[in-house]
Curated annotation (Swiss-Prot):
InterPro entries: Cation/H_exchanger_TM (IPR006153), CPA2_transporter (IPR050794), Na+/solute_symporter_sf (IPR038770). It is a multi-pass membrane protein. GO terms for biological process: intracellular potassium ion homeostasis; potassium ion transport; protein targeting to vacuole; proton transmembrane transport; regulation of pH. Keywords: Antiport, Ion transport, Membrane, Potassium, Potassium transport, Transmembrane, Transmembrane helix, Transport. It comes from the Eukaryota. Belongs to the monovalent cation:proton antiporter 2 (CPA2) transporter (TC 2.A.37) family. CHX (TC 2.A.37.4) subfamily. The gene is CHX20. This is Cation/H(+) antiporter 20. The keyword Signal does not apply. It comes from Arabidopsis thaliana (Mouse-ear cress). Operates as a K(+)/H(+) antiporter that maintains K(+) homeostasis in guard cells and could regulate pH. Plays a critical role in osmoregulation through the control of stomates opening. It holds the Pfam family CHX17_C.
Length: 842
């Protein structure tokens, strides 16, 4: 049954009345959208282990749905993607493209580009000029090889389109690749992003030129128009840009200021006004004769980058645009791409020529100029491959070229495959040639060792999720800082999850600020973030060097950023926030009369953050402390230090034995040196009944691993451990005997004794070891079902939400130099000596 767009109805009456929904516009659009999203998401999952950007999956998905693969089945094409439906699908996809280019404009900070310096500008110019010139040369060959005399496009427009296609760098895709490789906040990442931003702006200018020239018609037919038309189009486009930046930009600053009240809620009317502005700007440039996406992009540039308005605006629309509408555009591109059009050795030779020219031009141009401005050769080569990234903007150029009949089907398919190949090779190539992207770490000495050798400087890496962690971390760090340590250097790492959302990249730009990691450089008048403001005040009040850093990463690889930073900065201890946090009104003994109540229900920031902590504990190159915050640092519960900072008043250190507990008393000793901190050390002695009956630990069944504690698999010498424990205690007493209260207990029930300490109102903070090489008392708890096994048996008991514990908990793990692996265990009692092994038949 033949169809045309004018005779198609929007919706059907349903199958019960004899209608086929696929013969109606809206039901067919639903089916097309669902199929496109399902295929692109499936491919994204397949490509994820290869660390490829999502755009690769979407481009490949579009090609597979088109005539190159599934489209070879004509029944499928006629039913799912009939010709009459394509204008509808392309119109919906174009709306998504329009708003996505608005988001791209929001990502580009023009003031940041101006501050990027001559180095980035020089690299960008070289990265555009050489491939553009090479592209012009290739264009002559392709025009004379792949075009007939009847369909040859005009020289000018074809040369410009080919030059732009080969010289462009995809700014959003490059940002995503840099983030995946942990390079976004490095020097090379800063240079690449700045150069790509220059490149992006230049590409849009060249694209506007190409569109204006293409509007003049080609040699292959069509109505000839005066060359003055192209000139008028260009002048009108330039006038539009000037008007937007001079008139509209100040207006949008006013809108952003009015639209972001103090309660952080963006007013609906201002959001609607802005979205309408996107549509009007797109219509204006289409009216001029330049593609509508150019207007949306320029309008995005007018939105202020500081403040919350732009960020909130993106959060409102990006999921719908990037997740639903944008894949439709890739699909429409794929439906136009027929790889079968590349026939014969000559055509495949043209594909090879285009790929080699694109790669060589971009890489060589970038490399030469980067070396000239004193970038190391390895980094310069890496920059060349990074700048060779293509993506959505490349497809936009190609689709406009095909729409204007500048590119025929064969040339279009060749250039799409070129874009796909150059982007696909970026990640593996950069990982191969740029060593810092591999994430290797050195192993450092633990805190106890640093007491003897580097007492003049204590380096701490304090991680936080957001403003809620600031006061507790400052309070803890202030308690560790003493007058006897000449210098404390604090690295504050704000952990931010990298998602597929565009706003993640904007967060990175804010953090980077001209390339510096989560920076302490702010433009005049810019508001300090809530996270860093507290630490900046702390730095000014005390003798503490504070260096803010940002880690923007997917949660599965966040631990790599933390461990790498600990390695790079040679820190002695990493402090991690627990994934659960109690309300401050629950937290402290001074004001809380009951451990229960609503405050006893913790706020869970997410299981993903728990996994981050577990991976850091396993891979850290130094000692690690996990802070279970129950109101530590709240004004009501704390005492001011001499410099005005909050400090923990009363600290209890629980000691059973083992390396983690030895690290705990070392930390407790440092706290005792603070004049405002009172430290109590409670040593639990092994009961007489356990001295004659040793405990052997065996691996837990795989089914229950998440509910069992992890201990070290190295063979343990009980006598050696006992000797080390006694030595550590003697050393502790000799240094801090006059500053601490020391107690010894031999409990009948270890859990009851621990809970009595935690439920008392005597302490603000309890410090315990993780207990990976446990004493007999701690090992006896191995059969207990764990709620938080990563904290060890004692830490788990104190962190449990059902035990009504009042103080905050600090669980310490000493860095293990032996590189031994942890293994989850369950407990049995035997007559053998204490051992922890991998034998399941003990």
């Amino acid at each position: 049954m033949p169809f045309n767009i004018t005779s198609v109805k929007t919706s059907s009456n349903g199958v019960w009345q004899g209608d086929n929904p696929l013969n109606f516009a809206f039901p067919l659009l639903i089916v097309q959208t669902a199929l496109i999203i399902a295929v692109s998401r499936f491919l994204a999952v397949l490509f994820k282990p290869l660390r490829q950007p999502k755009v690769i999956a979407e481009i490949v998905g579009g090609i597979l749905l088109g005539p190159s693969a599934l489209g070879r089945n004509m029944a499928y094409m006629d039913r799912i993607f009939p010709k009459w439906s394509m204008p509808i699908l392309e119109s919906v996809a174009s709306i998504g493209l329009l708003f996505f280019l608005f988001l791209v404009g929001l990502e580009l900070d023009l003031s940041s580009i101006r501050r990027s310096g001559k180095r980035a500008f020089g690299i960008a110019v070289a990265g555009i000029t050489l491939p553009f010139i090479a592209g012009v040369g290739v264009a002559f060959v392709i025009r004379n090889t792949l075009y007939t005399a009847a369909d040859k496009p005009g020289y000018a427009e074809f040369l410009v389109f080919m030059g732009v296609a080969l010289s462009i760098t995809a700014f959003p895709v490059l940002a995503r690749i840099l983030a995946e490789l942990k390079l976004l906040t490095t020097q090379i990442g800063e240079t690449a992003m700045a150069a790509a931003a220059f490149n992006d702006v230049a590409a849009w200018i060249l694209l506007a030129l190409a569109v204006a020239l293409a509007g003049n018609g080609g040699e292959g037919g069509g109505e000839k128009k005066s060359p003055l038309v192209s000139l008028w189009v260009l002048l009108s486009g330039a006038g539009f840009v000037v008007f937007m930046l001079v008139v509209i930009r100040p207006g949008m600053k006013w809108v952003a200021k009015r639209g972001s009240p103090e309660n952080d809620v963006v007013r609906e009317s201002y959001v609607c006004l802005t979205l309408a502005g996107v549509m009007v700007s797109g219509f204006a440039t289409d009216l001029i004769g330049i593609h509508s996406i150019f207007g949306a992009f320029v309008f995005g540039l007018t939105i202020p980058k500081d403040g919350e308005f732009g960020q909130r605006l993106i959060e409102r629309i990006e999921d719908f645009v990037s997740g639903l509408l944008l894949p439709l555009y890739f699909a429409t591109s794929g439906l136009k791409t027929d790889v079968a059009k590349i026939r014969g050795a000559e055509s495949w030779g043209m594909l090879g020529l285009v790929v080699v020219t694109a790669c060589a031009g971009k890489i060589v141009g970038t490399f030469v100029v980067a070396v000239m401005v004193k970038v190391p050769a390895r980094e310069a080569l890496t920059l060349g491959f990074l700048m060779n990234t293509k993506g959505l903007v490349e497809l936009i150029v190609l689709n406009i070229g095909k729409e204007k009949k500048v590119l025929n089907d064969e040339t279009f398919a060749i250039l799409v495959l070129m874009a796909l190949f150059t982007t696909f090779i970026t990640t593996p190539t950069v990982m191969a040639i740029y060593k810092p992207a591999r994430g290797t770490h050195r192993k450092l000495k633990d805190l106890s060792a640093s007491q003897d050798s580097t007492k003049e400087e204590l380096r701490i890496l304090a991680c936080l999720h957001g403003p809620a962690n600031v006061s507790s971390l400052i309070s803890l760090v202030e308690s560790i800082r003493t007058t006897k340590i000449l210098r404390l250097k604090l690295f504050v790492m704000h952990l931010m999850e990298l998602t597929e959302r565009s706003s993640s990249i904007i967060m990175v730009q804010r953090a980077r600020k001209n390339g510096l990691p989560f920076v302490h450089r702010y433009r005049h008048g810019e508001r300090h973030s809530n996270v860093i403001g507290g630490f900046e005040a702390y730095r000014q009040l005390g003798r503490v060097a504070v260096r803010p850093i940002t880690a923007v990463s997917p949660l599965p690889t966040m631990h790599e950023d933390i461990c790498h930073m600990a390695d790079t900065k040679r820190v002695t201890m990493i402090i991690l926030p627990f994934h659960k946090r109690w309300n401050a009104d629950h937290g402290h003994s001074h004001h809380h009369q009951d451990g229960g109540g609503d405050g006893n229900v913790p706020e869970n920031v997410g299981h993903g953050w728990r996994l981050v902590n577990q991976r850091v504990l396993k891979n850290a190159p130094c000692s690690v402390a996990v802070l279970v915050d129950r109101g530590l640092g709240s004004i009501e519960a704390q005492t001011l230090s001499l410099d005005g900072s909050n400090v923990v008043e009363r600290v209890c250190v629980i000691f059973f034995g083992g390396p983690d507990d030895r690290e705990s008393i070392e930390l407790g000793g440092r706290m005792a040196e603070h004049p405002a901190v009172k430290v109590t050390v409670i040593r639990f002695l092994v009961r007489e009944t356990l001295r004659s009956t040793a405990v052997t630990l065996r691996p837990a069944p795989s089914k229950g691993k998440e509910k069992n504690y992890a201990f070290l698999t190295t063979n343990v010498d009980p006598e050696k451990e006992k000797e080390l424990d006694e030595g550590a205690l003697e050393d502790f007493k000799s240094k801090w005997k006059e500053m601490v209260e020391y107690k010894e207990k031999e409990p009948n029930n270890i859990i009851e004794e621990i809970l009595s300490i935690g439920q008392s109102k005597d302490f603000d903070l309890i410090v315990v070891g993780r207990g990976r090489i446990p004493s007999a008392e701690v090992a006896a708890l191995a059969e207990r079902q764990a709620e938080h096994p990563e904290l060890g048996p004692i830490g788990d008991v104190l962190a449990s939400s059902i035990n009504h514990i009042i103080p905050s908990i600090l669980v310490v793990q000493q860095h293990n130099k032996a590189h031994v692996e942890d293994i989850t265990v369950s407990k049995i009692v035997s007559e053998s000596s204490l051992s922890i092994n991998g034998d399941t038949n003990v």
